[in-house]
Amino acid sequence: MRRKLVAGNWKMNGSLAANTLLLTEIKSGLGNATSDVAVCVPSPYFAQCQGLLNGAAIALGAQDVSSHEAGAYTGEVSTSMLQEFDCRYVIVGHSERRAYFAETNELIAQKTVRALNAGLTPIVCVGETLDQREAGQTDSVVAEQLNVVLASIAASDLAKIVVAYEPVWAIGTGKTATPAMAQEVHAMLRKQLQAKNAEAAMQVRILYGGSMKPENAKELLAMSDIDGGLIGGAALKAADFLAIVHAA
């Protein structure tokens, strides 16, 4: 039985005061959550959030990482820097990184390998746009995104990754993916993972990242191949985030 994972992605949001309030509320409302919980915060807040999460059953995560080990790469953050703040997870290949920063499947694969080599758990994001969805290209696009990553890692490392499906077409467009539609893609991803390592594929958690909210979390999380959520907007509101955590 795969333990659910609810990971909040704060994106480019937060402040010292707001972070303190948000994490204090989340910690106090966590109770005996049966899922794993993580927050992926902007890098300037690593030290603050590390302190706020001390002793809490909430893991710290990053929103991106460099494909390089160290050196003259202005603005980049390395895996060794993440390790110093006890980061456990790192998001790679988020749809916003692909769209706004021209990240390729190959670069995302390099970041995945870099994270694994550092003992971090990469949350590998895949997903299709509205145009791709309407052209019937969902399976081919998502499969190719994951294939490039899978080709870059050892079969023995498969169980060390997390996959997140982000239907880009369902984020901020007014369109929604039903639980059945999400499950269909998650099942396809699971089958793809099984081709790499059948046993490990059953351990890999596949998160749903298409605007999971308190209103739809329970239905989505009831699907057999939806193992948690990568939460955007709802992660910035303690009550909403906690509702999703407890739905898991």
UniProtKB/Swiss-Prot annotation:
Principal location: cytoplasm
Span of the signal peptide: none
PROSITE patterns hit by this protein: TIM_1, TIM_2
Pathway: Carbohydrate biosynthesis; gluconeogenesis; Carbohydrate degradation; glycolysis; D-glyceraldehyde 3-phosphate from glycerone phosphate: step 1/1
Residues at which substrate binds: N9, W10, K11, G172, S211, G232, G233
HAMAP family per UniProt: TIM_B
Assembly description: Homodimer.
Origin: domain of life: Bacteria
One GO cellular component term noted in the UniProt record for this chain: cytosol
Enzyme type, top EC level: isomerase
Keywords of this entry: Cytoplasm, Gluconeogenesis, Glycolysis, Isomerase
Function recorded in the entry: Involved in the gluconeogenesis. Catalyzes stereospecifically the conversion of dihydroxyacetone phosphate (DHAP) to D-glyceraldehyde-3-phosphate (G3P).
Organism per entry: Janthinobacterium sp. (strain Marseille) (Minibacterium massiliensis)
Protein name, UniProt field: Triosephosphate isomerase
Compartmental location: Cytoplasm
Catalytic activity: D-glyceraldehyde 3-phosphate = dihydroxyacetone phosphate
